[in-house]
Amino acid sequence: MFRMLSSSFEDDPFFADSFLAHRESMRNMMRSFSEPLGRDLLSISDGRGRTHNRRERDDGEDSLTHADVNPFQTMDRMMANMRSGIQELQRNFGQLSMDPNGHSFCSSSVMTYSKVGDEPPKVFQASTQTRRAPGGVKETRKAMRDSDSGLERMAVGHHIHDRGHVIRKSKNNKTGDEEVNQEFINMNESDAHAFDDEWQNEVLKYKSIGRSGNTGMRSVGHEHPGSRELKRREKIHRNSAIESGRRSNVFVDKLNVKGSPVKITKK
């Protein structure tokens, strides 16, 4: 299951080293769990000084025992089918994201948690997000946290067609080491500021289009007779509530209640 969900992360250089180290740690932990149970479970005594010997069973019993173990194979087949479905979904989304005139958003994440004895829990988290807009505009976000090694990483990339500017930050909470790197794709470092402005302008252009479209939809809706009637009723209700509030204030003023303040103690 973990392999199925993390395959896309393992192929990414940003996550690859951390995933390999984490997987090896998980293997060692699972190996330590399986060692006490490594002997043949069918040779366990039945409590009366006798053992179950699989070889002494007839073919019918042996096939029955084989059938009892096969649910694990059923689970494997189910996971394989799930893996195929996810891969097909990723292929379809990949084709959709290549449309130069479309918007798309893709997000993937994986998390593992393990705790052995009195040791502190080990948490591993990784996530990646990709947003695309027409005109070759793209933003990528990646993050990873490993409590075992104390390492935290994040990367944010802005892209326009084949040009890109990626900023990566990393910090080791155990050693206190911090590092910041920048990557310039198909451009010089001196062009980074102008590229960032260009990327922001492209993003704002599509945001303004979205706002104008929503405003147009609201304007059309207000012209509908039902909307006008609903607006009129809301106005009447609002005026009635204001008038009622005024009367309540007058009534309170007439009461002219006097007294000493009471101190309230919160527990």
UniProtKB/Swiss-Prot annotation:
Interaction with COPS3: annotated segments: 50-125
Tissue: Highly expressed in skeletal muscle, heart, testis. Also found in lung, but not in spleen, thymus, bone marrow, liver and kidney.
Entry comment on modification after translation: Phosphorylation is required for binding to YWHAZ.
Chief place of localization: cytoplasm
Molecular functions per Gene Ontology: DNA binding
Keyword Phosphoprotein attributed: yes
Pfam families cross-referenced by the UniProt entry: Mlf1IP (PF10248)
Highest taxon, organism lineage: Eukaryota
Subunit annotation: Interacts with CENPU. Also interacts with NRBP1/MADM, YWHAZ/14-3-3-zeta and HNRPUL2/MANP. NRBP1 recruits a serine kinase which phosphorylates both itself and MLF1. Phosphorylated MLF1 then binds to YWHAZ and is retained in the cytoplasm. Retained in the nucleus by binding to HNRPUL2. Binds to COPS3/CSN3 which is required for suppression of COP1 and activation of p53.
PANTHER family attached to this UniProt entry: MYELOID LEUKEMIA FACTOR
Purpose: Involved in lineage commitment of primary hemopoietic progenitors by restricting erythroid formation and enhancing myeloid formation. Interferes with erythropoietin-induced erythroid terminal differentiation by preventing cells from exiting the cell cycle through suppression of CDKN1B/p27Kip1 levels. Suppresses COP1 activity via CSN3 which activates p53 and induces cell cycle arrest. Binds DNA and affects the expression of a number of genes so may function as a transcription factor in the nucleus.
Protein name stated in the entry: Myeloid leukemia factor 1
Underlying gene: Mlf1
